[in-house]
Amino acid sequence: MTIKSVLFDFSGTLFRAEPTESWLRAVLRDADLTLPEGELTEAADALEAVGALPGGGVAPRLPEGSEDLWRRRDQSAEGHRAMYTAISRQVRLPDARLHDALYERHMLPAAWGPYPDTAEVLDALCERGVAVGVVSNIGWDLRPVFREHGLDRYVGAYVLSYEHGIQKPDPRLFATACDALGIAPEDTLMVGDDRRADGGAAALGCAVHFVDHLPAARRPEGLRPVLDLVG
């Protein structure tokens, strides 16, 4: 197999979300609200425990009766927002409007940072003539994140679940990305952190490689093996 294109997941693969405490601090600052340090830490820990930060890598604690919404959350912007604000609202905050503000914050480029080797690997792939796509289960437009961090120039196609009404592991989402890049699935490598969701590319005939969803400091070179797989 000759790899001619690589599809990447977004969160936990190319980018990592900011820590939950930083997420909460930013929203409180923007709202001109102050909490005593102990209360702020307690609230951040509670948000972390329920998995309120989308893409934060923590399995969520779902509100009762929300299982169906959880299963289809990435198929629409409305569903994604409704699910994650419902998760967040399990934690008491000093102003109820902060839950929507937290959701808005997580969509900002400032809330995300690329892994240390992301730019290096994307640049090397482009130098080798390998096409790059991003396939993400998500409820909002992540393109500004790539632009803000100077990585948009490497990406030939973005295939986002909410824009297509289908989500990984549905092979149709990966097929859409392959079609957009003009590369056959059997010449494509999918790279992601979710064994079930990203592993769905295998049903289409793509090779699949997994990385660990870890804080950036603990995964400085997690993407570099992709270059060896491409050859």
Residue ranges, per PLM feature:
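Asp-based, Mg2+/Mn2+-dependent phosphohydrolase catalytic module
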Residues: 1-8, 38, 94-98, 119, ...
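N-terminal helical cap/lid subdomain that shapes the substrate entry/recognition surface
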Residues: 3-116, 143
